[in-house]
Amino acid sequence: MVKNLFISVIPQEEKEKNKGSVEFQVFNFTNKIRRLTAHLEFHRKDYLSQRGLRKILGKRQRLLAYLSKKNRVRYKELIGQLDIREPKTR
């Protein structure tokens, strides 16, 4: 597993203050998603991890939708920092 995949965009002092913020939650979900993706490259038949990955992806998608409605500027900054594609709109 490559450690460069995990991002440290948020400084340590901000991590301690804002653990409940939307940005921090999306940041944590992104790290979990990248870790699970790396795991699933080696263990293709780990169906429980696949299910967990889909659940985390859904949670992150809902948080990003909330953030895009509330504050579009912070949403664009976060997507740029975490290198996440913007979801397609229906």
Curated annotation (Swiss-Prot):
It is found in: Plastid, Chloroplast. It holds the Pfam family Ribosomal_S15. One of its GO terms (cellular component) is ribosome. PANTHER family: RIBOSOMAL PROTEIN S15, BACTERIAL AND ORGANELLAR, SMALL RIBOSOMAL SUBUNIT PROTEIN US15M. Gene3D superfamilies: S15/NS1, RNA-binding. InterPro entries: Ribosomal_uS15, Ribosomal_uS15_bac-type, uS15_NS1_RNA-bd_sf. Its main location: plastid. This is Small ribosomal subunit protein uS15c. Belongs to the universal ribosomal protein uS15 family.
